[in-house]
Amino acid sequence: MHTDALPLLKADEYPGGLWYYEPHTYQPYRYVLGRVGRHPLVCIGINPSTAQPGALDPTLKSVERLANANDFDSWIMFNVYPQRATDPNDMDRVPDRALCDENLRWLQAVLAQTEPTMWLSLIHISEPT
């Protein structure tokens, strides 16, 4: 994997300490959210909700508990599609290719810049109506 073209995973100060958060401000999409460490538990979900540094949703509170209980020094959340939505009906019907490409770049960056353990979290999602 060539890392010279990948974005730099950079920690910043947010409520509660140092976080990885891409983009660095609340947007209608999110690529990366997690705690800083060298050996993270990396979880891949379907799409992000409203969570942000210092304000985790129930899913990310569970990821954080699981990482802590299993002696990981950190955790990072990714999603198959980066668009934020609390309701599947609000998601893009046709994926935005630019969002998908940037999402993959951030996943590659984390894999190249940390020593992760991957965890794929699957749930049943109905087709939006």
What are these regions, as identified by a protein language model?
Residues 73-89:
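Short connector loops at secondary-structure junctions
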Residues 60-68:
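Short catalytic helix/loop segments, enriched in acidic residues and glycine
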Residues 1-57:
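Active-site and ligand/interface coordination hotspots across diverse enzymes
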Residues 120-129:
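Residue-level detector of conserved catalytic or cofactor/ligand-binding positions
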Residues 29-35, 103-110:
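Short, charged beta->alpha transition segments
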Residues 58-61, 101-103:
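Charged helix-capping and loop-helix junction motifs
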Residues 114-119:
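Hydrophobic beta-strand segments of well-ordered beta-sheets in folded domains
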Residues 84-105:
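Charged, often glycine-rich, active-site loop that binds/positions anionic groups
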